[in-house]
């Protein structure tokens, strides 16, 4: 009985030690290569097309899209791969001459490290 209780306690402590490690490893993967294109009208009050129009233009050129989200007076497009960022930006600039297209790529720093320090991590 004592031996069984010791084994249960050992397993419980081992799980408590491994849990933070698992959380750190999985949280660092949240900085996947998400590329976002932020579409903003060049003139205040100018109308932007709906998400379906943007989807059609990008799909015609074989550009994969994760999501298209309207936000305030702009549209945010999340792409499937970072390699398609430049092509998608060019397609949208030609399809939407009345809008500015800004490409944003996340830093390669994991989220947990960004939260620990507001200063960028530098070596050397």
UniProtKB/Swiss-Prot annotation:
Pfam families tied to this protein: SecD-TM1 (PF13721)
Cellular location(s): Cell inner membrane
Protein name as annotated: Modulator protein MzrA
Lineage of the organism: Bacteria, Pseudomonadati, Pseudomonadota, Gammaproteobacteria, Enterobacterales
Similarity section: Belongs to the MzrA family.
HAMAP family the record matches: Modulator_MzrA
Record's keyword terms, sorted: Cell inner membrane, Cell membrane, Membrane, Transmembrane, Transmembrane helix
TM stretches of this protein: 8-28
Primary role: Modulates the activity of the EnvZ/OmpR two-component regulatory system, probably by directly modulating EnvZ enzymatic activity and increasing stability of phosphorylated OmpR.
Keyword hit for Cell membrane: yes
Keyword RNA-binding: no
Main location: membrane
Quaternary structure, from the entry: Interacts with EnvZ.
GO cellular component assignments: plasma membrane
UniProt GO molecular function: protein kinase binding
């Amino acid at each position: 009985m004592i031996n069984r209780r010791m084994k249960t306690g050992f397993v419980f402590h081992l799980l408590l030690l491994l849990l933070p490690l698992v959380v750190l490893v999985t949280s660092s993967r949240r900085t996947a290569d998400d590329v976002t294109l932020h579409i903003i009208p060049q003139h205040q009050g100018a109308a932007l097309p709906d998400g379906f129009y943007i989807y059609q233009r990008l799909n015609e050129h074989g550009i994969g899209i994760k999501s298209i989200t309207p936000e305030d007076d702009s549209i945010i497009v999340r792409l499937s791969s970072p390699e398609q960022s430049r092509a998608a930006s060019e397609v949208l600039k030609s399809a939407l001459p009345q809008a500015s297209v800004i490409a944003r790529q996340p830093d390669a720093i994991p989220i947990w490290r960004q939260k620990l320090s507001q200063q960028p991590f530098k070596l050397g």
